[in-house]
């Protein structure tokens, strides 16, 4: 497994104004080990995101209110918005809080976002983040060097979940804090419900989707029931309606979905506007994009894919393959090929537990490295890998046009509007109604005149 982990967590890049939000509140001493990983962690999530100015101001206000109402108001918290469509938020013991633009897009009022941020503050004040950092240090010490890399620690951080008890404790602390700060204590339960809807929706269209907020912050019935009970004990907050209108107004214009600059996943296809290429993964693979690489896995975990790019100072595909990409694996004879006007080379490699189909394709100065791994390689499976490699090509004009960046815009519903009439103003997409309901926190397509709703538009 160490070899496969190295394959999936390596750090070569396929990758483009950034802003950090600070609450004006003295700082406890940072954990130097965790602090050293912050840059790598941010890079793993696509770097910092320059959110719309009204949203930045609102987040700053929310953080300041939460800190003032928290159990330790002397700690300074800094919130960084990450340029990732995934739904995630996490805290470091330094007081650094991270939230993805994907999570901001899912929230529907200031109380929901306050609940997420207060939950993470709860992890810090309860020392959960320090305990998780210690776990990470131990994992780093025990992990073979072959898995380590510039983004290795960040990847392991993502996999270190808080315990169920810690999650419930952070929920309770967070709900109590937002109520004290003047926010609706039921915001936490609403956001947990939205997370559950999102998980159901994503699970239907991408069954193996990973690394969401839910993977480390599960929205279990027990957790939702506990959140509702805690909220009932802390009633007395501001108007939900006012919170929703203000939040959605500030949110309008935020980027939505994959950043075309770093490539986008469309089912089994991966398309990259800047690098001008696409590739089709085999049937059964679910793709996940990151700034470092495209990763693909099958539902049973028996096959995997990695695609990244390097520049080797003029070396061609055969020379690139000759360098050896898999520790502990022996390459077969290298075979050159030509596909879609591009030159490439391929080989197989055999490791103790996995067999690999390797390919290098040259496009301009870039060498694209494609690695397929299988626990049990068969001739039929190898042919499907080769067919996928053969799908690598430059983009068509229509494909480039379809890769325009998307954003969320909020619109007020008219008296005659329905969910379907609102969707006529949005980009056409598969599962459009279901996505609309999830984004707007709705169980059913019932629209209220004058209320704001999120729509997805292309730039």
Residue ranges and their predicted role:
Residues 1, 11-252, 256-272, 278-280, ...:
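A Zn2+-metalloprotease active-site environment signal
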Residues 114, 285, 370-410:
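Surface-exposed amphipathic alpha-helical segments
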Residues 284-286, 294-297, 322-336, 341, ...:
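Extended non-catalytic domains of envelope/secretory-pathway proteins
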Residues 306-309, 365-376:
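Short, well-ordered beta-strand elements
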Residues 322-371:
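Signature of long, low-cysteine stretches enriched in small and polar/charged residues
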Residues 397-430:
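Primarily a LysM-type cell-wall glycan-binding module
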